[in-house]
Amino acid sequence: MSHHLFLPVVIMVVSPIPPGAFQDSVVSPTQGEFEDLDCGDCGRPEPSSRIVGGSDAHPGTWPWQVSLHQGGGHICGGSLIAPSWVLSAAHCFVTNGTLEPADELSVLLGVHSQDGPLEGAHMRSVATILIPDNYSTVELGADLALLRLASPAKLGPSVRGADLALLRLASPAKLGPSVRPVCLPRASHLFAHGTACWATGWGDVQEAVPLPLPWVLQEVELRLLGEAACQCLYSRPGPFNLTFQLLPGMLCAGYPAGRRDTCQGDSGGPLVCEDGGRWFLAGITSFGFGCGRRNRPGVFTAVAPYESWIREHVMGSEPGPVFPSQLQKPQSGPWEPREENCTFAQPECGKAPRPGTWPWEAQVTVPGSTPCYGALVSDRWVLAPASCFLDSPHDFETWRVLLPSRPEEERVARLVAHENASRDFASDLALLQLRTRVNLTAAPSAVCLPHHEHYFLPGSHCRLARWGRGELAPGSSAQLEAQLLNGWWCHCLYGRQGETVPRPGDPPHLLCPAYQEEEEAGLCWVDSSWSLLCREEGTWFLAGYRTLSDGCLRPRAFSPMQTHGPWIRHVTQGAYLEDQLTWDWGPEGEETEKQTCPTHTEHGACGLRPKSTPAGVLWPWLTEVHVTGDRVCTGILVAPGWVLAATHCILRLGSTTVPYIEVYLGRAGVSSLPQGHQVSRSVVSIRLPRHLGLRPPLALLELNSRVEPSPSALPICLHPGGIPSGASCWVLGWKNPQDRVPVVAAVSILTPRLCHCLYPGILTPGTFCVLYSEGQEDRCEVTSAPPLLCQTEEGPWVLVGMAVRGNRELFAAIGPEATWISQTVGEAHFLHLGGSSYWSPEGSDLCPQDLAGSASSPKVTALLLLLLLAPLIPR
């Protein structure tokens, strides 16, 4: 039973009672005392008190509640409706369309605690299981791991209608104070909207949090919702962006605000409502989207519509179930809203009128240590890094917590560190319980936490907030603003090479911000630690956290909070875990496909570009090199502070002055790139390799400051070898040097022999040539010296060469200059693609007469000869 939130991943299995302890007999020595109890006196438990709000039931309060066992453990609940009959949910006994054998099930009656039987408790075998012929399905077309059913193994791609089952016992139950039948409503019985009813069971107390020992029967008060009100709530997207259409015979109970509900393991149990001094079985626990989630009430099978079906199948049983007449028809109260005028409950957490001033910020002070910052996650619990406290004496009398707008400091009752806190950076978390509950208002208030299936959408507005020990932000407030990177960029840029990128709905390994403002020069963030807050529909979630950075740059990757929801929920039993609020996936829908991250080099990721990205949108290493005199050249970012360009475009022949050069990244012509920001840098030096008697074809431009790696400014990988093998290659450039929108042209690299034959006497060492695919020769203009890029399947992009002056087919290779680049740059990303040498044998005698020097002959003739004489390097 739950008054919080739940995800159905654990089936409650309890088997403390030894096998054979009952053997269809009564435990109590006074077993015959109540054999003549009047079965017509249904729905009248022994007088007792009960605790409101989802808690332990008093023994004997709900004497019709039974526990269904299979394989020695509890699987579902049920209700005794006659000495030989139990009513439960059909889905408890159907797996893949097949009904479970009745002889594998048993019914435990008169039990209050699963840890030990009461007097009068006894077990009965099941003789027969009956389900309606119209036990049907409603296809949702989505992953239904969220649905609360009896067992995850029994989940299917649908929600069941007519979800009820009759179980005939092998021998009648022994009636007594703890074993009595419940009344059944007639088909004409009406339960008023807003009626306070009660659900009972031994299910999970929260999502994925089983009922703890001694497994005492739980009860929770729920209010009935009318069909219009319930459908209104379920018509709004919720977990996994699912909506749901109620079927006839379904009944809803709960609250728009959630936090009280049934949970997994309660399936088949009773929802009873009092009417005229009797308790009627109004519904059977069927399913739900999580447990106790906001605007997601529990769904029950209404019993009244099945009066005829029940009577038909129990006919001849004496005594049978009782269907008392309803003394007075109720009228729905004002609580029932109209569907077109439905009001949704809003989150009770994550409200910050002034971002940057966080009403949940908690400052924990321990004698002898600097303050540690965390976040208030409920009215009694603070979440903070465990590393703040692992070496501190646990003398909680001296610990204090300062909360916003609280004149006095709070005292600490206990500390619960994550079990992996000392071994795993991603589990560096601890929960501090306050001695007294805090009245949550505008300040202090709690931050929202994400469920494990929460998918923070790419582009979500996020912000850094203080976390753990460390200094304040060294820069302006704008330095803390960020948008969230999509999963592919995050995991492939900052995660492990070759890892599979989690799909939306699966817990991510990392969360990564893309900062909106560039790093301020001279600042270092090494002494500060941060959490990542992300906003959805005006509500802030604690999305991730990171302790002290390992460098001066702002933190790039955060440990996600999604994976820790079950632990936080289990410890606090009151933290504000909130459903996803934003579902506008926009252009990032391609992330639903399985993707793997390319190889990294020793300096990290390079040459990353999503497969599905349009050619003119994102080439994060492509730079515009603006040279004095309105000349614009193509450049390639090869390290955070270096750009590679063609010498002939940067330096004019005969010029003795060094031009002023500006470099721009993060834009495609006049448009800025998504997932990042435009970057500009000035060039402070131009480096050329030493070439005896020849002007070197490549130049390195040193930038005045480093460029932060991002999807809009990322170094490319460099190929240090010869002609790459098994790679597809393209020339990347601009169709029009005025608008500078990137275009690519597919090419094949020719063998050294063919290249030598086509250009005899004019090839310099380290030069190679390409053949354009049909119709692509004129896609890129050549004055800006475009680069040649290659990529192997699933691999990163690699720079192979830069165009030679005035020629679209000839390129200066990167390989011969690899040593010079490595010595000059230091952080260049080299990735060898294999392949053959660039050098070819000298002498025209090795070239066919018709081919030698035929580079300017008609292309058709040249292409035919090339195809006949030598293979092309495959694209």
UniProtKB/Swiss-Prot annotation:
Residues 51-315, 347-573, 608-826 form the Peptidase S1 domain. One of its GO terms (cellular component) is extracellular region. The 3 protease domains are not proteolytically cleaved. Its EC number is 3.4.21.-. It comes from the Eukaryota. Residues 24-50 form a propeptide. Its main location: secreted. Disulfide bonds join 76-92, 197-273, 230-252, 263-291, 372-388, 462-534, 490-512, 524-552, 633-649, 729-790, 757-769. Residues 320-340 are annotated as: Disordered. Keywords: Disulfide bond, Extracellular matrix, Glycoprotein, Hydrolase, Protease, Repeat, Secreted, Serine protease, Signal, Zymogen. It is found in: Secreted, Extracellular space, Extracellular matrix. InterPro entries: Pept_S1A_polyserase-2, Peptidase_S1_PA, Peptidase_S1_PA_chymotrypsin, Peptidase_S1A, Trypsin_dom, TRYPSIN_HIS, TRYPSIN_SER. Glycans are attached at residues 96, 134, 241, 341, 420, 439. The keyword NAD does not apply. GO terms for molecular function: serine-type endopeptidase activity. Residues 1-23 form the signal peptide. The active site is at 91 (charge relay system), 163 (charge relay system), 267 (charge relay system). GO terms for biological process: proteolysis. Belongs to the peptidase S1 family. The first serine protease domain is catalytically active, whereas the second domain lacks the essential His residue of the catalytic triad at position 387, and the third domain lacks the essential Asp residue of the catalytic triad at position 697. The second and third domains are therefore predicted to be inactive. Serine protease. Hydrolyzes the peptides N-t-Boc-Gln-Ala-Arg-AMC and N-t-Boc-Gln-Gly-Arg-AMC and, to a lesser extent, N-t-Boc-Ala-Phe-Lys-AMC and N-t-Boc-Val-Leu-Lys-AMC. Has a preference for substrates with an Arg instead of a Lys residue in position P1. This is Polyserase-2. It comes from Rattus norvegicus (Rat).
